[in-house]
Amino acid sequence: MTIKLIAGLGNPGPEYSKTRHNAGVWFVEELARSHNISLRPEKKYSGLYGKGLIAGNLVHLLIPTTFMNRSGQAVAPLANFYKISVDEILVAHDELDMLPGVCKIKKGGGHGGHNGLRDIIDRMANNKDFYRLRIGIDHPGHRDKVTGHVLGKAPSAEQAKIEQAIDEASRCLDIWLKDDLKKAQNRLHSFKAE
């Protein structure tokens, strides 16, 4: 099984582009840059869309331009149109329960309170079997501070760690698509940002 669709979650507009909640967007932007795939607005998928070869595999890239809690409105129509099964989808998103500089790949699971994941699960007929790239942004310590934290910008040292982890995740995606998931996970999960 290979990955055919990679979606990077976030909120649209310049006021959100540098916020922690857009870490998934940063990953897809990095993939587009490093693989020379242009992303263009596509109304029928409610997002920025492009396709190209990554490690010899045709991959669809999507950045929903809906707000985070409507991410499924973008992901589901694209998956349906190209007949991409749920387990051929990778969703990149910010993860409160991991430190900046850490990224992990997992398959399936709940939404963990993440509204973007919740909407995708809802619009995929409650099928949770897609892969996730969890990009650590850390937890602010109290649930009342979560909204301000995810919609805030990371301090520069923290941001640098997030970007290093995203770069490594991009390299590991190539390993995953060329070789196997386990090899990519072993490398990515042992990565430590400086």
UniProtKB/Swiss-Prot annotation:
It catalyses: an N-acyl-L-alpha-aminoacyl-tRNA + H2O = an N-acyl-L-amino acid + a tRNA + H(+). The keyword RNA-binding applies. GO terms for cellular component: cytoplasm. InterPro entries: Pept_tRNA_hydro, Pept_tRNA_hydro_CS, Pept_tRNA_hydro_sf. The record marks 11 as: Discriminates between blocked and unblocked aminoacyl-tRNA. One of its GO terms (molecular function) is tRNA binding. It comes from the Bacteria. The active site is at residue 21. It is an enzyme of class 3 (hydrolase). One of its GO terms (biological process) is protein quality control for misfolded or incompletely synthesized proteins. Its main location: cytoplasm. Its EC number is 3.1.1.29. TRNA binds at residues 16, 67, 69, 115. It holds the Pfam family Pept_tRNA_hydro. It is found in: Cytoplasm. The record marks 94 as: Stabilizes the basic form of H active site to accept a proton. Keywords: Cytoplasm, Hydrolase, RNA-binding, tRNA-binding. Belongs to the PTH family. PANTHER family: PEPTIDYL-TRNA HYDROLASE. Hydrolyzes ribosome-free peptidyl-tRNAs (with 1 or more amino acids incorporated), which drop off the ribosome during protein synthesis, or as a result of ribosome stalling. Monomer. This is Peptidyl-tRNA hydrolase. It comes from Colwellia psychrerythraea (strain 34H / ATCC BAA-681) (Vibrio psychroerythus).
